[in-house]
């Protein structure tokens, strides 16, 4: 089992949609090859925020998932990557995001229609998400139990 499994889906979405690569190109600098691609660092920050992180130090949660996510930059590397963002780089990031968004939207007509009981649902997209909670075996600070009295979290909602 993988804790915070939903964060893997966010990272895969960024990678497979081309966002990570486009951000890497938008933040690339001449004659400088960083250990961690700056596009990947920005995606990791977004994944960390989607995973519930509230500070740059929250990136360490992703670093503990290295077997699933691969190498994740340290907090100081994230700070350096953010410090490197100039107004021109932010504009290139904006253009890169728009390019990827257009690409993703262009792929939607290629999706097969959803069907239920051999009935075509047309443009409706069906998401079948498992609602089970992952049990946490200890009460966390100021946590309220679920309606069943246990403690846990939904891996796609954290």
PLM feature segments, named:
Residues 1-158:
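Dynamic "connector" segments at or just before major functional cores
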């Amino acid at each position: 089992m993988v804790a915070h499994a939903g964060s893997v889906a966010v990272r895969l979405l960024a990678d497979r949609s081309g966002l990570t690569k486009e951000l890497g190109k938008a933040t690339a600098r001449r004659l400088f090859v960083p250990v961690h691609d700056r596009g990947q660092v920005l995606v990791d920050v977004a994944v960390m925020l989607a995973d519930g992180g509230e500070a740059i130090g929250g990136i360490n949660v992703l670093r503990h998932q290295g077997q699933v996510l691969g190498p994740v930059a340290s907090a100081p590397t994230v700070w350096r990557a953010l410090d490197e963002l100039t107004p021109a780089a932010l504009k290139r990031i904006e253009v890169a995001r728009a390019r990827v968004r257009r690409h993703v939207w262009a792929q939607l007509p290629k999706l097969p229609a959803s069907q239920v009981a051999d009935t075509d649902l047309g443009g409706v997209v069906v998401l079948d998400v498992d609602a089970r909670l992952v049990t946490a075996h200890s009460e966390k600070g100021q946590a309220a139990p679920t309606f069943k009295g246990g403690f846990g979290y939904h891996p796609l909602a954290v």
